[in-house]
Amino acid sequence: NSESKYDKKISASAFTDYVSCSLKFFFGKIAGLAEPKDLPDEIGPHTVGTMLHTVMESFYRDSIGKEVTADYIRQREKLLPAMSKAAMIQELKLNPDYEYLQSALQQIIIKVIEQYALKVLRHDEQIAPFIIKELEDREAYTPLFSIEVEGREEQVRLMGIIDRVDIHQNKTRIVDYKTGKDQLRYGDFEGLFDEEAKGQNKALLQTLFY
């Protein structure tokens, strides 16, 4: 089957791994050696980021294809505590049917996710109205991309799972939620693809990938 060899796809994060450290890409994507997950009593940046993505998808899920106004956002902000709690339960694999007394750490997690989500929504309020086109679409962006390997043409399947695609003032925007402190500037274009360069801008690489 000619399509079967393209079942494995290169995502934006895999692409940035390859550019920043080809050895890390080999161990993770070729050799299949996954990075250790956060310990149960430790909440790492990746876990926080995943929970924020879950909350934002829940917040806008019913708005796909519709115009989102600032009033609509403000009215739904009261749902953030419940959405943040649900995201934590899902990510930490807690029992959703058990009304447990939340630990101090769990309360802090919920509050942190709320604050991250509010920061996104405050920005959304300022630019509203806009129309949500897609959220976390896992099927729409999987094109074949031609590359040259040892003098011959090969193809790889790319995969882009974009957090949000919306339309604002007749322009299509790609929105990628971040919980870290990503740089908005870069030096030279070639330096973005040099794994020995200092301070590689992974957020910009992902944007170019999309």
Question: Where are the model-predicted features located?
Answer:
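Short loop/turn segments at secondary-structure transitions that flank enzyme active sites
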Residues: 24, 33, 58, 62, ...
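C-terminal, charged and often intrinsically disordered regions of DNA end-processing helicases
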Residues: 1-58, 155
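C-terminal substrate/ligand-recognition segments
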Residues: 51, 59-62, 174, 206-210
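Glycine- and acidic
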Residues: 3-14, 31-42, 63-74, 92-107, ...
